[in-house]
Each structure stands twice: as C-alpha cells, then as structure tokens.
C-alpha cells in the first residue's frame, strides 16, 4: 500500500512540475550575468562567418572594445552592420 501511495505522489509531482515548465519564462542572459562586450565580439565573429570578405570583422571588434559593448551589431540589421561592410 505504501508503494502505491509513493508512486501516486511521485507521478503527481512530476505532472505538476511539467505543467509549471510552461510558465517559466526567463532568459539565460538575464538569469545569469553576461558581458556585453563578449556578446558584441561574438556577434562580430558571427557576422564575419555570414558575410565573409564583405564584412570587416576586426573593425567591428575594435568598435566593440571602444564602445565597451554598448552598440552590439546584429547581423540581420543592416543599420547596425553597415559601418563594417565593404564593397570589395
């Protein structure tokens, strides 16, 4: 009888836990500390991979260091990466 009661409690707790997973909305970057300069430089590297020789990755990284990560480039936003694009 005790085993059945324990099994029912475990199943009920598992169901309650799974139901509450949907309500847990948090961003890992906000839940833990993050370094804006690190994200900025990583985005520069990602844009360099995407655009290849048309993107000045070193210039982008230098601007991250000078601005201390305040202006993070987004590869899909032309306005944020236009200073780092070249015509070849």
UniProtKB/Swiss-Prot annotation:
Which keywords does this Swiss-Prot/TrEMBL entry list?
Answer: Disulfide bond, Hormone, Neuropeptide, Secreted, Signal
> Where is this protein chiefly located?
secreted
Q: Is Disulfide bond set as a keyword in this record? A: yes
Question: Which InterPro entries does this UniProt record tie to the protein?
Answer: Eclosion
List the source organism. Bombyx mori
Query: What highest taxon heads this organism's lineage?
Result: Eukaryota
Please identify the protein, giving its name as recorded: Eclosion hormone
The UniProt similarity line reads: Belongs to the insect eclosion hormone family.
Protein role: Neuropeptide that triggers the performance of ecdysis behaviors at the end of a molt. It triggers adult behavior patterns: larval, pupal and adult ecdysis, and plasticization during the molt.
The record lists its disulfide bonds as 40-64, 44-60, 47-75
Please list the GO terms describing molecular function.
ecdysis-triggering hormone activity
GO biological process, any: neuropeptide signaling pathway
* N-terminal signal peptide: 1-26
Q: Give any Gene Ontology cellular component.
A: extracellular region
Q: Does the keyword Transport apply?
A: no
Which compartment or compartments is the protein found in? Secreted
């Amino acid at each position: 009888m005790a085993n059945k009661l324990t099994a029912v409690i475990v199943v009920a707790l598992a169901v309650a836990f799974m139901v509450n997973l949907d309500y847990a909305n948090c961003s890992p970057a906000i839940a833990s500390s993050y370094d804006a300069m690190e994200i900025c430089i990583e985005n520069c590297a990602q844009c360099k991979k995407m655009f290849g020789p048309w993107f000045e990755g070193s210039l982008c990284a230098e601007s991250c260091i000078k601005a201390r990560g305040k202006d993070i480039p987004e590869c899909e936003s032309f306005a944020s990466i236009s200073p780092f694009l070249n015509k070849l």
